[in-house]
UniProtKB/Swiss-Prot annotation:
Native organism taxonomy: Eukaryota, Fungi, Dikarya, Ascomycota, Saccharomycotina
Other noteworthy facts: Present with 721 molecules/cell in log phase SD medium.
UniProt repeat feature Pumilio, residue ranges: 563-598, 599-634, 635-671, 672-707, 708-743, 744-783, 784-821, 823-861
Region (Disordered): 236-270, 467-551
Chain intervals with Low complexity compositional bias: 478-499, 521-543
Domain PUM-HD: 539-888
One Pfam family it belongs to: PUF
PANTHER family xrefs: PUMILIO HOMOLOGY DOMAIN FAMILY MEMBER 4, RNA BINDING PROTEIN PUMILIO-RELATED
This protein's UniProt keywords: Phosphoprotein, Repeat, Transcription, Transcription regulation
Composition skew (Polar residues), residue ranges: 243-270
Presence of the UniProt keyword Repeat in the record: yes
Protein's name in the database: Pumilio homology domain family member 4
Amino acid sequence: MSTKGLKEEIDDVPSVDPVVSETVNSALEQLQLDDPEENATSNAFANKVSQDSQFANGPPSQMFPHPQMMGGMGFMPYSQMMQVPHNPCPFFPPPDFNDPTAPLSSSPLNAGGPPMLFKNDSLPFQMLSSGAAVATQGGQNLNPLINDNSMKVLPIASADPLWTHSNVPGSASVAIEETTATLQESLPSKGRESNNKASSFRRQTFHALSPTDLINAANNVTLSKDFQSDMQNFSKAKKPSVGANNTAKTRTQSISFDNTPSSTSFIPPTNSVSEKLSDFKIETSKEDLINKTAPAKKESPTTYGAAYPYGGPLLQPNPIMPGHPHNISSPIYGIRSPFPNSYEMGAQFQPFSPILNPTSHSLNANSPIPLTQSPIHLAPVLNPSSNSVAFSDMKNDGGKPTTDNDKAGPNVRMDLINPNLGPSMQPFHILPPQQNTPPPPWLYSTPPPFNAMVPPHLLAQNHMPLMNSANNKHHGRNNNSMSSHNDNDNIGNSNYNNKDTGRSNVGKMKNMKNSYHGYYNNNNNNNNNNNNNNNSNATNSNSAEKQRKIEESSRFADAVLDQYIGSIHSLCKDQHGCRFLQKQLDILGSKAADAIFEETKDYTVELMTDSFGNYLIQKLLEEVTTEQRIVLTKISSPHFVEISLNPHGTRALQKLIECIKTDEEAQIVVDSLRPYTVQLSKDLNGNHVIQKCLQRLKPENFQFIFDAISDSCIDIATHRHGCCVLQRCLDHGTTEQCDNLCDKLLALVDKLTLDPFGNYVVQYIITKEAEKNKYDYTHKIVHLLKPRAIELSIHKFGSNVIEKILKTAIVSEPMILEILNNGGETGIQSLLNDSYGNYVLQTALDISHKQNDYLYKRLSEIVAPLLVGPIRNTPHGKRIIGMLHLDS
């Protein structure tokens, strides 16, 4: 058929992008399909295609992996995925494309899009599907695209027919001869109906050609040679691709999972379409070029695109690959994977695609896929007059960029250097080069970033830094989205390695008030940093202090006392030195005591009030002789009051009083303490010295204490510490001393009963007499307090004395009778309703129930009628009801 007729047939095909159709027609006209030899060659190859097509029912297996892979085997390795810059509209035309009039949704091929490369390697999945599509029992494929008869699929060859001399395993790409033959077979004929035309259309897979090649070919291209001569010169052609500035290179192999070392992914082709077209002389008028294409612009960077294989472009953004803008209205699901070393935007191992990021100046040197030096530049179509970094970078010769971006490093965010680049043009981390070896197996063994059944998360690109920052916080990291500590890190991952070492989390809840659960919180937590630094400094200081103490303690490990003779005093106030001397006293006994006594006797008062020295004095007082102890007593006696009031000295002085064995020593102590007895009795530390004197001295020696207390009885008895001294006097004093003291106290019993501390003195008198079975002062106390029984019973401290009397069997009945006779029903009712009196009433009921039924009956008759109303619901009311057995 003629090329003109073929062009008319293509124009009749519905849903065909005009740009693509013109491009295909131009290519077919260049190939001179009218030639009989061409038809014979194409038909022969087409027959082979039709024979092999029965084994490939649907698209190749690499496009739709076996369902089991999505479940148990993890997600598709990211190096096998395609990175396609997208736009929120259905088919994602790039914003900078030259032809703004190109259709957006009607062209599944996205013919107006920028050139894109696709990695279509079938090797990783041939083991699972063997090149055939997954089918049901009836032979019908599960995938609707596979069932589409209009999608005529070429067979998957074990070796690429184009690269027979390169010894490179073939990929899923098909040679141009196969494509041409299949295209001619699939085109509608004159006799077919319109619906058959639509069903017979298929998308073709072409090798990477620049838009300039296709546009020039579409504008009345004239061939300088016939097709037969061109076919003979295909293998000999060495001229560059069409266009002075274009150098086409075709991908021949992708990453392989087997142990075969992978060769370069981009190598100069031996039988590429660019070489086939290199011998063609293009003569296109400038006017036609202006009329049929977009307005002429200056020369733009060389870019290369591949047709979308077997189903058009990706219909959704790829959320895993960086640089894909997402719809801003998409749900905010994109959080960092919790798995370590997982593939994601901020992980250690980054995804890779042959389509490099638009900001890359050339094939990235850090790509994990081994590449030879390639001049291919991948970038959006920019204004050549623009001063942006990306454009000026691509105009450098030899593929060696000299922009500031290269000086800063491959991971610097481009839009921070040059504002002409938008936020969607952000670079991403790339693994170091693999040095022409297959990627390590662990590269594909990490867990998927999301479960198999969870849909990919859509998130606007400009939200990624915020999300990464928030996710860092969700993992216990208080990091900022931007940090001056990592100037070369990618935005959103700037503080990924800056993990918190401290445990402070100050301001966590405060920050959450200003954001949605911390997802978009970029506030700086300076408090955390300060606290972490403080904690670190404190830890270092503590460690240094512990180390110093260990060294000091080890200093005396093997030491002997003779080494420190003459400098013992310097060891007494040191913790380890003091312990060393005490140990020497235990080992050497009197010998060590003599040496220590001679060097420390002049510093006795100083050591007795020292936090460490007082322990040495206490140990020394036990080891020295009586003469030496008397010397120490005489030396320290003028300072007994000062020593007694000191928290450390009081212990040393008490030890000295315990060690007294002679009257001389006792007299020295008595003479020193007598003037200060009342003062010491009321002191927190001094009262223990007075009590120790009552315990260790003879009655005649501590008589000075009874004399001082008798003169200041009310002052000492109503004091917090003095009342304790007075009780010790009742314990250690003689009968005469105690009776004299009790007479003094009995005259003050009314005041003492109502005093917070004095009431304990009155109770102690009753207790001591009960122990001695002598109740002289007890009866006297009851006799004095009975007329005020009801008044004292409702008093906070007086009620304690009344209860003590009721619990004393010898005087309990007289007190109960006093309550019944003098108080009567009114007095008992006041006790029942009082917070303190109810305890007195409960005690009276309990004691009378055990000892005197008559008194119990009388109390019951008075109390029972009063237990009505709210009183029954009170805790004490319920207890009284239980005691009277009124709850039944």
